[in-house]
């Protein structure tokens, strides 16, 4: 058989694998994606949602850098909804409910029509390693495929085990085979493997649900899209519905806990803390009875409904008994029962910030194999891994996004340096620079990285560069124009503001007043009809200028610590006085800067002072 040679191989066809494959191929590399089943490429295994606090920021950042998830969700969704509009700009986001069927079928179509990319259905059993460098893979069919770099985005399929009640069987997703040999191959090459667990709720037949007993929640006809390149006049407004558990639900759940695999001990691994099962909610909050339950249609092409909030791996009879106590679900028919899945993963402390393995050169990891949870988390890691695999194949330095530049950087930095006892989910609270890393300003802060990566077309880069110039020029103009007191007060009165000015003011300062919007300035100065994302940016940067400046000062301090480099072969045992726990963490992670060292669990300020003193 002819030798099969590629530049980048991607193992896995989920959200991480999709972004990695597209990134490598779009950068001109001959790439191959391996998937267990062609028909489940880009499958949304759990909820139909894209976005959420922190997650939406990841999607927006990928969009600016050249990723696909944002624009694909804009095209193939059932609704987009604005969240946290009453809060500050750091919290405002868009959340999408994707059409799960169209999302995956159209993504497969996109992949099949992407130049430089081949898609192959087969199970990868081994990685080929020579002299500490990855050389390719071996599949279940015994075929060897060679490549300069390999990206592993295996999801929940490494020794995956499905659990429903007291029933357990091997599968990476319900109805699909697991990959039983690959994690053993990784162990053979010095990579540590551990296990996590995640779970999903039952799916119901829409025709059996009484929606009249629930609150209907519609999306926005004219939303902020995930991608600023999306040109769409009107969006779908297919509703979701809200209901609640009751005291009877909790009573039944408590009776059924004896059958829960997390109580019986069948499941011993940890699941995502921020997406707990109903079993876990009842155990942790036994006195709370009204947990929210959202009913979300999975696709316009099916009658299947996702029951968000009722995640459980209890046996089928227990799932049905609990559902019967919820308003609107009294007669609901189950199409798929909820289940848990346990799987192997490789703790991300074994990676560089490029997502390349420290143990095997040219081997990259992305998504749940790194101990993360969520489509968006997997996708952004896949994108970065795919970009850096392509760059390594070209002999280029990796692209690194640090935690002051994006939530992508926060996620990667956290999973490498801060081990958690459960799958990692990105959250705004994990970032020190939330006001800087807003959902609405990814185009401002990541434009330089987008140019460096080189996936976006010259037309899109020009559009971004021009948009940034408009924002900066307009802010400077508004800060220079004065408006008389009488005219300014007339505008404030018209807008319902209680504030009264005692002298004239610059328009930039007037815009800082709560009730004043950029569009309302048309009464006192000439303004242009810029796209909404530009007007929003002008307004936010002026209104929150002092807070943004304070955060920028913190970022400068962070950057200075990042600039103090630590040699790659540095021997931390030479530094006297460092605590044992710090030394263990430093030797495991092998940080490349003082800033990175300071974020390792167990490393104190005193340890950093000793390290800095030694390096000087």
Spans of features found by a protein language model:
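An anion/pyrophosphate-binding glycine-rich loop and adjacent beta-alpha core
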Residues: 39, 183-320, 328, 408, ...
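Conserved beta-strand-loop-beta-strand element in the redox core of flavoprotein oxidoreductases
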Residues: 128-144
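Beta1/beta-strand and adjacent pyrophosphate-binding region of the FAD-binding site
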Residues: 4-16
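Conserved N-terminal/central alpha/beta ligand/cofactor-binding core
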Residues: 22-126, 141, 153-173, 177-183, ...
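A glycine-rich dinucleotide-binding beta-alpha-beta segment and adjacent secondary-structure elements
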Residues: 306-372, 400-413, 531-585, 590
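Short hydrophobic core segments
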Residues: 11, 144-155
């Amino acid at each position: 058989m002819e030798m099969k040679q590629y530049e980048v191989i991607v193992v896995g066809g989920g959200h991480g694998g999709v972004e990695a494959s597209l990134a490598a191929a779009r950068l001109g590399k001959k790439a191959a994606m391996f998937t267990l089943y062609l028909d489940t490429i880009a499958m949304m295994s759990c909820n139909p949602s894209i976005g959420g606090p922190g997650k939406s920021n990841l999607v927006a950042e990928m969009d600016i850098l050249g990723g696909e998830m944002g624009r694909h969700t804009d095209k193939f969704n059932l609704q987009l909804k604005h969240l946290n509009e009453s809060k500050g700009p750091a919290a405002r986001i868009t959340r999408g409910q994707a059409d799960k069927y169209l999302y995956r079928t159209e993504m497969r179509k996109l992949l099949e029509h992407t130049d430089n990319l081949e898609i192959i259905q087969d199970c990868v059993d081994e990685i080929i390693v020579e002299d500490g460098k990855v050389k390719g893979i071996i599949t279940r069919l015994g075929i060897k495929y060679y490549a300069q770099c390999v990206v592993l985005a295996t999801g929940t399929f490494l020794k995956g085990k499905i659990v429903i009640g007291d029933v357990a069987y091997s599968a990476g997703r319900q109805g699909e085979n697991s990959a039983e040999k690959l994690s053993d191959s990784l162990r053979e090459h010095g990579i540590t493997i551990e296990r996590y667990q995640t779970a999903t709720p039952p799916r119901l037949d829409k025709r059996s649900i009484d929606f009249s007993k629930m609150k209907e929640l519609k999306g926005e006809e004219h939303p902020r899209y995930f991608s600023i390149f999306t040109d769409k006049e009107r969006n779908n407004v297919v509703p979701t519905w809200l209901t609640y558990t009751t005291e009877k639900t909790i009573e039944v759940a408590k009776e059924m806990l004896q059958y829960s695999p997390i109580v019986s001990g069948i499941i011993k691994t940890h699941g995502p803390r921020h997406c707990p099962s109903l079993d876990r909610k009842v155990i942790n909050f036994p006195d709370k009875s009204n947990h929210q339950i959202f009913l979300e249609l999975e696709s316009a092409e099916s009658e299947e409904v996702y029951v968000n909030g009722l995640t459980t791996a209890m046996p089928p009879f227990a799932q049905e008994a609990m559902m019967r106590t919820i308003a609107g679900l009294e007669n609901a028919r189950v199409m798929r029962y909820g289940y848990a899945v346990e799987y192997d993963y490789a703790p991300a402390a074994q990676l560089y910030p490029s997502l390349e393995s420290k143990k095997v050169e040219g081997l990259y990891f992305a998504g749940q194999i790194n101990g993360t949870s969520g489509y968006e988390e997997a996708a952004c890691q896949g994108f970065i891994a795919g970009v850096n695999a392509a760059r390594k194949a070209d002999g280029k330095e990796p692209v690194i996004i640090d935690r002051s530049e994006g939530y992508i950087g926060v996620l990667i930095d956290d999973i490498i340096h801060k081990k958690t006892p459960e799958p990692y989910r990105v959250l705004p609270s994990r970032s020190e620079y939330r006001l800087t890393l807003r959902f609405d300003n990814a185009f401002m802060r990541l434009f330089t990285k987008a140019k460096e990566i080189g996936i976006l077309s010259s037309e899109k880069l020009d559009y971004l560069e021009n948009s940034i110039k408009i924002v900066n020029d307009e802010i400077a103009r508004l800060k220079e124009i004065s408006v008389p007191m009488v005219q300014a007060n007339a505008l404030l009165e018209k807008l319902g503001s209680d504030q009264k000015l005692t002298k004239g003011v610059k328009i930039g300062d007037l815009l800082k007043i709560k009730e004043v919007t950029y569009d309302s300035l048309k009464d006192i100065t000439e303004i242009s009809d810029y796209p909404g994302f530009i007007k929003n940016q002008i307004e936010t940067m002026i209104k929150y200028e002092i807070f943004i400046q304070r955060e920028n000062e913190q970022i400068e301090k962070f950057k200075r610590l990042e600039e103090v480099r630590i040699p790659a072969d540095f021997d931390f045992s030479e530094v006297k006085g460092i605590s044992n726990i710090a030394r263990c963490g430093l030797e495991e992670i092998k940080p490349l800067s003082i800033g990175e060292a300071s974020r390792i669990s167990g490393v104190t300020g005193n340890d950093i002072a000793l390290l800095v003193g030694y390096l000087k």
